[in-house]
Amino acid sequence: MLYWLFSIEIMNINHVDIFYMESKEKTTPKEFSLSVIHILHNCSPHLKKGLRDEFYKLNGRCEIYRNKVELREENPLQGFYGSRINVEAIVGVNGSGKSSLFEIIYRVINNLSCLLNRGKRRKTADDLYYVKDLYSELYYVVNGQLARISCLGNKVEFQMGNEASVTLTAVKDGMVSSEKVLMADFVKWAKENFFYTIVTNYSLQAFNANDYKRERCLILKDGLDDAMAETQAEGHAWMDSLFHKNDGYMTPIVLNPYRDEGVFDLNKEHHLTLYRLSAILIYAQKHYRRFMEDYDLNDILYTFDASSLKKKYVEKYQVKFIVYDGYKCSPLEHNDIGTEILKCYGVMDGLIFDDTLQRTAAMYLIYKTFAIANSYPAYEEFSSLGELDKFTQEVVPETMDLICRLVKTIMRDKSHISLKIRQTLHFLNALKKGTIDSQTFLTSKISHREYFLCVNEGKDLRSMRDIQEYLPPSFFQIEILMNRFENGERVNDTPIPIEQMSAGERQYLYTFSTYIYHVLNLLSIQESHRVRYRNINLILDEVEICFHPEFQRRFVNELLGYIKRLFMNRNASFNILIATHSPFILSDIPQSNILYLEDGKMVMPEGIKNPFAANICDILYQSFFLKQGFVGEFARK
């Protein structure tokens, strides 16, 4: 049997070992699912909204017996959707409580995250805010064991199976508690017993910060009393802190798309989608599959553009333009920090700063190295390097050693954190070898096929990891061109820019690319000392927005297909939770995995026909509570 300790550090002095877990036998099937949400009676009305003080059961993995959640011995749907995948849904009319129930999940995860991350370095990530007056429980199943997270006002309890529960405290005796979870325990616990949640909600009304600012919150800083911790949190919405990933996916939830005060930037979202889609579309083409039915990739064109890099130096980090524009490597005897970084990457020999492309690549390496050192908890020991505006300072011996160790650590890191560094190094090496013609790359659009021939050194790029590795660096703009097919025949005379696709088609691309991007990033984290989640919870709120019924009909099958084709479920377990008004989506989900809501209450499914593979009209009538039939109200009258 395997035992491990979950420790709490008290005021950074004492380690109190208060918890151990017993692993299941190796033969236990890998599984993960969210099973029950329980709203407790003293939960604030502002938080539960129209929900009731009751249990909400998401699937048939658990039973509620005498106000207690009990795990069934067998999972009747084990393997139903494929290895290590579970799909479940919440349905109900508008106002029935679907999104409110999701928000309870987000708050529970947020509060636990506040306590787990307390004392951890998250320099470029937003502060987390602990939600007060939350009394709710979240039950989930991991590999045959029932886990419980209970938010009980100023404390959070966690229990796995029949073992003793762990209590983490936000406020104790009127003061912000100084308890801190050790990083080593956090890492092990996250991998084995917790999950990462990726949320999408493209509704214009969703995630508006102003809707949450009335909720009482705390900022958990040592030395503050309860009142001061609440005062310092005033004006902040806890939800705003969950849009960022700049802590290396340590905080176990991310909301999409990114919103600033409730507003999301469509142009920025589109730009991110182009970057995420590039590797996915190339992968699909190489494996003779279509990422999207009726469309094939025609080409991806890259155009050199150094303006965004200049903005980072000059506008974000306040480097004077004359310093940025005139920078060249310093003499050998008196290196500056930028030069030392380039030396440690081994790119100085033959580097020509008068060559625009080489100079841009070198300046990007300097920028990105500073960014990694200052952004990610795994690189905390290198934060003393300082900010980017110090890159021209002379190197002292201590800094020289720090830079050398930093670069070596980045070079060993094969996760998403160092990906853009690796892409830039491949590009720079190709430039120096002469396989890239600078003039052509400066003045022309470059096809992705042509680019790969220049940089991949003859490798057959077929895996998603390899394709991502050899994509162009961030100082290239991306243009994706598609071909459209009907009955197997191409119908477009000229390639179709992705911007000319319909709103529904682009929404389809945005949604799928978001999930694939984040999951691949999570799975790229391999180092044992970093937080690695291997249970992944995908929440899709009103996923059918902009989708034609045919897209809705195919949605679940397509999502399952991507998970399997990219082998994501080989090393991770997935729970897919969908709030929907679509009978087509519901027809792919067995009744045991559906929570029916009406007026904030769970409706028992007795008398409701199982929607799996059922007639759409039957599903509309019974599962979506269409009490007035299927005819428009004006016509009915």
Predicted feature residues:
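Short alpha-helical segments and helix-capping/turn motifs at coil-helix boundaries
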Residues: 117, 124, 237-242, 580-581
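Switch/communication elements of ASCE P-loop NTPase nucleotide-binding domains
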Residues: 13-15, 32-34, 39-110, 476-623
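C-terminal alpha-helical "lid" subdomain
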Residues: 622, 626-637
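Coupling/switch/interface segments within P-loop NTPase motor domains and analogous charged loops
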Residues: 3-31, 129-134, 139-145, 149-493, ...
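Acidic, metal/cofactor-coordinating or nucleic-acid-engaging core segments within structured domains
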Residues: 204, 521, 554, 628-629
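Short, flexible/disordered secondary-structure transition segments
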Residues: 115-119, 266, 522-526, 566, ...
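Beta-strand elements of modular eukaryotic interaction domains
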Residues: 78-81, 126-129, 243-245, 499
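Short secondary-structure boundary/capping segments
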Residues: 107-108, 118, 152-157, 239, ...
